[in-house]
Regions:
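Active-site metal-binding loops of divalent metal-dependent hydrolases
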Residues: 31-34, 92, 189, 222
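Generic recognition of short, well-ordered alpha-helical segments
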Residues: 40-41, 101, 138-142, 197-201
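Boundary/entry segment of secreted carbohydrate-active catalytic domains
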Residues: 12-38
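C-terminal domain-boundary segment and adjacent tail
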Residues: 13-21, 53-59, 63-64, 118, ...
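Metal-dependent polysaccharide deacetylase catalytic core of the NodB/CE4 family, i.e.
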Residues: 25-27, 47-160, 180-192
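Bacterial Sec-dependent N-terminal signal peptides
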Residues: 1-13
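Alpha-helical packing segments of well-folded alpha/beta enzyme cores
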Residues: 30, 38, 42, 77, ...
Length: 238
């Protein structure tokens, strides 16, 4: 990324914009567990509004349409999503609690998943979504090596467990803009899996609202925004 610089001629001051295009806030839409609904339902809505999402997958379960949890994505579906500009990232090989396994097993969980994602999609994962959002400094040191970062804070974007409504999502987004922050959402299933939606139109309307606010809110993949933020924070202006 090229950092966006703001220049005031009168005062002769230069500053680095908080977000690309000098927007007021940023949003990354992340989706966990490689659920097939992410391809059949979520991606078409994102594509309609030219929005890009980040999808965390578990290589062990790919293509399992009879999974008791929810039918899973296939690799061909992942390749199509990548072609549309979406990010496929590491969510571990088999979705264990990474804080409860030994270092050798942890390395297998991350490296095996990285390898198969690269082999199947042609793109090496540059970010990670931690299973159960569980991590420690020791786990992070292993998992984030060679990556731009990991999701460490998230806004649960679902209904059965997170209890989202149109009003609560609107409040979250307004606060994000007011505070000039980057917000990361976390969604699992739509009709299946965990934290399903009783009213999925609320989610689709949120996507539409993000597209409407494209001049003030930068919506992009987790890795793209994380890379910009890291560069921004590393800049020293003299």
């Amino acid at each position: 990324f090229f950092l966006f610089l703001s220049l005031s001629v009168k005062s002769q001051t230069v500053s680095v914009a908080d977000f690309l295009g000098d927007r007021q806030a940023a949003v990354s839409l992340t989706f966990d567990d490689g659920i097939q609904e992410h391809y059949t339902l979520v991606a078409p809505h994102l594509n309609r509004y030219t929005l890009r999402g980040t999808f965390g997958i578990n290589g062990k379960f790919m293509g399992d349409i009879d999974d008791h949890f929810a039918p899973r994505l296939t690799w061909e579906e992942c390749r199509r999503m990548v072609a549309d500009g979406h990010e496929i990232c590491n969510h571990s090989w088999s979705h264990p609690n990474l804080t409860a396994i030994d270092r050798r097993t942890l390395l297998v969980e991350i490296r095996k998943n990285d390898s198969i994602i690269k082999a199947e999609t042609g793109v090496k994962p540059t970010s990670i979504l931690y299973p159960f959002n569980a991590t420690t400094p020791q786990v992070r040191a292993v998992c984030e090596e060679g990556k731009v970062g990991a999701r460490l804070e998230q806004f649960g974007l679902g209904q059965r467990n997170s209890g989202c409504t149109a009003a609560s999502i609107d409040t979250w987004l307004r606060q994000l803009i007011n505070d000039r922050r980057w917000g990361v959402t976390m969604t699992h299933g739509i009709y299946t899996a965990w934290d399903q939606w009783d009213e999925p139109w609320v989610l689709w309307n949120f996507f539409r609202e993000l597209a409407f606010k494209k001049d003030s809110v930068w919506v992009d993949t987790f890795s793209n925004i994380q890379a910009y933020v890291k560069e921004r924070n590393a800049v020293t202006l003299t």
